Curated annotation (Swiss-Prot):
Name this polypeptide is given: Uncharacterized 12.3 kDa protein in petA-petD intergenic region
Primary subcellular site in the record, as a coarse category: plastid
Compartment annotation: Plastid, Chloroplast
GO cellular component: chloroplast
Domain of life: Eukaryota
Native organism: Chlamydomonas reinhardtii
Keywords: Chloroplast, Plastid
Length: 112
């Protein structure tokens, strides 16, 4: 679900409550089998999309990341990211991940 779609549904305020930092929208294909590889730090939050045909699940995760040069931090670490899945009768489908603006995912995190 995109921010524009959430805004049209009146869900943008709800999403902003979940985002403690400025987050950016990053396309992030994800196989459902990879979910168990993440350290989940909250529960799924079900939402309905406009058509009502699927649930949108929001999950906070810790993800390996690289800090950007502007932060002047060397090496990698972990950051809290927000994972958004759409679940329909065929199982989890399109996924988005929202990352803090000052971090980048590692190459390993991108290789799903």
């Amino acid at each position: 679900m995109t921010l524009a779609l959430m805004q049209s549904m009146g869900k943008l305020k709800f999403l902003h409550c979940l985002l403690p930092l400025p987050f950016r929208d990053v396309p992030f294909p994800l196989r459902a089998s990879k979910l168990r590889d993440f350290n989940a730090i909250n529960k799924f939050v079900p939402l309905r999309d406009v058509s009502g045909s699927c649930e949108v699940l929001i999950l906070y995760i810790n993800i390996e990341c690289l800090h950007t040069p502007k932060e002047d931090v060397s090496g990698s670490g972990t950051a809290t990211a927000i994972l958004i899945l759409r679940r329909s009768s065929g199982g989890p489908t399109a996924t988005k991940i929202y990352l803090p603006e000052d971090v980048l995912p590692t190459a390993e995190a991108n290789e799903f």
